[in-house]
Each structure stands twice: as C-alpha cells, then as structure tokens.
C-alpha cells in the first residue's frame, strides 16, 4: 500500500480527477515535446462527458497553449478498458504528422496511471506491508498501538511536517470559504451558503449550534473547491469538505492541538489508502460512494481517534461511515461539482460525527468489517451503470432543468 501522502494532495478545484489529473498529464507531455508545432488531446468516457463542467479543457489548455496550439476532442461515448477517465495526448509536427502519442488515465484523487502495472510511469513505491484493515488492526492490538503509530512506523520522517502543512491548508480553506459570498461560477448560478450558515449557527443554542457550524465548515471548503480555490483532496476534490469540516470543528470546540490533529489525519489517510488500494476513490469508477462515502469513513476514523477510541471502535466508526453511503450515485448537474456534491459534503460531515458517537457507545464489536464493506463498495460500483458514474447522463443530472 502506498503512502498516505497520495491521499492528501494540495491543489486547486473543482475536480481532482477532471482538472488536477489532466493538468498534471498535460504538463508532463508538454515538457516531453517542446518542439511540437501543435497538440491534440482526446478525452474519453467520463472525462469527456463532464469535462466542460469540470473545466478539464481549460486546465489542459493553460499548460499546453504557451508551447503550441492545442485541439481538444471530446469522445464521451468511448470508454477505454482500463478506466473511464482516459485521455490521449498527441504531438504533431508542422505538417500535422504525429510525432508521439500517449494514453493515460486520471484514476481519482489527482493520481495518474498508464495502466501498465509495475512498469507504469506513475507506479508509486509501496510503503506499507499490510493491505487490509483486518491485518493492520491485528498489528495494532498485538503491539498496543493505534493506527497513527502504524503509519508513523512506515512513513518517511517528514510525514508529520507534511500532515501539518495539509492541516494548515485545510484550515485556510475553511476560513476562505467562510469569508467569501456571492455566486459560484457556472450556469447554475448557485449562491454560496457557508457564510450565512456560520452566522445563523452562531446564534443557536449549543445543541443546534454544533451541527450548524459543521455544516458551514463543510460548505465553506466545498464552495472554495467549486470556485477553483486551493483545497486538499481527502480523498478527492469532490469530497474535500468532509474531513476538514469535522477536524476544524473539533479543533475549535475541543481545543485539540495541531499535533493531535495531524495524528488523526494519519489515521484518516490510512483508511483512505486501504480503500484506494482495494477498491477505488474515483466517482467515474464506483460512483459517489467512493468519494463522499470514503471521506465520511476517513472523518469518522479521525474523530473517533481524537476521542480516545480503541482500534476496534475506530474501525467500526469508519465502517459505518462507508456502509451507509453504499450505492450512492455520482450524477453532478451540468457536470459541475456543485449539485448535489456540496450538500453531500455537509451531510457526510455530520454523519461522520454520528458514526463516531455511535461507535463510542459500544466496545467496537460488530458483524460487518470495514474490509468487507470496501469489497462490497467496489462490486456495487462496478454494477452501477455508467449513467450514475460521473457522466451526467442519469439521476439528478438528467432530471434537472436549468429553467
């Protein structure tokens, strides 16, 4: 299993798979072909279906146009075998003859793959010897350790500096989102709500105030993402509001130190990495259950650890966070990371805290394991038609009328 750094990537929204990934690929290909007279980029499947709404073409053109003209070709009905988010880069000479071509896939969370296994250009080093939560939890119990200590054992020495930086960016994204008002970009003309929710929540009694504040923090980050602001994938841009909202709320309301938050992030990253290794965090591959569902599991695990949960209680908390998002479709209206994505982040953040509380009332024993739910999520995602996997051809996206 790869480093948790691959789960937490700092970048700009609105989509890790549709903007961050393609822009990174475009930069690599452009650097290889500085002598090209022009470029063609063919976008396939989900990348083509919702690329306009996600600003995929703009992200690619920003990188390639300074070197040579680029033509974007959209093929939403063509799905390459390896992954729904396929793209082909072609470098052309002055006579428009191909100099080179490169097929690459944006596999979720800003990560790229050539689909070549261990010989892949983007193959990352495996840093963890164990790939299932069952085995990791057994290690923790045998050694009297928590999940963050397992991460500490195998990550590089700079992991805490990295996570503290991630936490700083998360805090800034909350603050920026709360400070901004107005309308989000795109044809939906969706008003920002975070600032209003924060003000209203502050006027309620503590029992309701807590929930309202969590809503406002999640909305703040998700709205920053939708407007192209700087956020952290956790595990993706589309689900980037859940973990920061939960941790920021606990940081403010319970005075947890930055160091304890970093340890909670390590635990969250471990759970996210397990899903990425054994299933997927790509909405184009498994639907929103792989994005918001996984984010809820990560936030549940992190919060349960902060409140002193045992390894089994933390596992139970994360299991519920993911289990109760099984089957969730990815059907963004107009291909934008706005409806229903932003509200889903807010609801998942409060659900994460509910799962943590539920798990803390018991000893962590339960029948369905986290690993089992991950496997079910993978199978469910593969069973879902492409209509419900980031193509905007079904569900809410199909039924919504801009008028």
What are the functions of these language-model segments?
Residues 8-28, 227-246, 288-296:
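Conserved phosphate/anionic-ligand binding catalytic regions in large, soluble enzymes, centered on
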Residues 66-204, 212-213:
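C-terminal regulatory domains involved in ligand/effector binding and gene-expression control
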Residues 303-403:
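Functionally critical mobile loop/hinge segments
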Residues 161, 171-274, 280-283, 287, ...:
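Accessory "access/gating" subregions that flank catalytic or transport cores
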Residues 216, 220, 241-251, 266-273, ...:
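Contiguous, well-ordered alpha-helical segments that form the cores/surfaces of helical PPI scaffolds
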Residues 2-12, 23-45, 53-54, 68, ...:
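Non-transmembrane, aqueous-exposed alpha-helical and coiled segments at domain scale
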Residues 19-32, 244-255, 300-308:
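Alpha-helical support elements that line or immediately flank enzyme active sites
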Residues 8, 43-49, 76-78, 265-274, ...:
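Acidic, glycine-rich active-site loops and adjacent beta-strand->loop/helix elements
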């Amino acid at each position: 299993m790869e480093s948790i750094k691959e789960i937490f990537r700092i970048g700009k929204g609105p989509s890790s798979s549709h903007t961050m990934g393609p822009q990174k690929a475009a930069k690599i290909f452009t650097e290889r072909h500085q002598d090209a007279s022009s470029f063609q980029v063919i976008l396939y499947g989900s990348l083509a279906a919702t690329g306009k709404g996600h600003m995929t073409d703009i992200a690619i053109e920003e990188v390639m146009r300074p070197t040579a003209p680029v033509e974007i070709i959209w093929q939403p009905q063509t799905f390459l075998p390896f992954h729904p988010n396929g793209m082909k880069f072609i470098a052309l000479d002055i006579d428009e003859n191909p100099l080179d071509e490169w097929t690459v896939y944006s596999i979720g969370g800003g990560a790229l793959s050539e689909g070549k296994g261990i010989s892949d250009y983007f193959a990352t080093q495996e840093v963890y010897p164990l790939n299932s939560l069952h085995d990791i939890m057994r290690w923790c119990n045998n050694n009297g350790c928590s999940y963050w200590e397992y991460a500490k054992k195998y990550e590089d020495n700079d992991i805490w500096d990295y996570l503290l930086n991630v936490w700083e960016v998360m805090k800034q994204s909350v603050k920026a989102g709360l400070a901004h008002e107005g309308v989000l970009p795109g044809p939906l003309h969706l008003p920002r709500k975070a600032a209003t929710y924060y003000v209203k929540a502050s006027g309620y009694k503590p029992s309701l105030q807590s929930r309202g504040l969590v809503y406002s923090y999640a909305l703040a980050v998700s709205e920053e993402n939708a407007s192209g602001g700087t956020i952290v994938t956790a595990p993706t841009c589309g689900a980037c509001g859940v973990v920061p909202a939960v941790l920021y709320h606990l940081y403010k309301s319970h005075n947890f130190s930055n160091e304890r938050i970093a340890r909670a992030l390590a635990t969250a990253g471990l759970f996210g990495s397990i899903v990425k290794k054994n299933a997927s965090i790509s909405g184009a591959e498994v639907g929103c259950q792989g994005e918001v569902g996984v984010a809820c599991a990560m936030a549940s695990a992190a919060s349960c650890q902060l409140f002193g949960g045992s390894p089994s209680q933390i596992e139970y908390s994360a299991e519920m966070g993911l289990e109760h998002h099984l089957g969730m479709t990815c059907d963004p209206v107009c291909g934008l990371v706005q409806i229903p994505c932003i509200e889903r982040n807010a609801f998942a953040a409060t659900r994460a805290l509910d799962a943590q509380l539920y798990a803390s009332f018991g000893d962590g024993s339960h029948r369905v394991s986290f690993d089992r739910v991950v496997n079910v999520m993978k199978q469910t995602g593969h069973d879902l038609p492409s209509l419900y996997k980031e193509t905007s051809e079904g569900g809410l996206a199909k039924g919504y009328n801009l008028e």
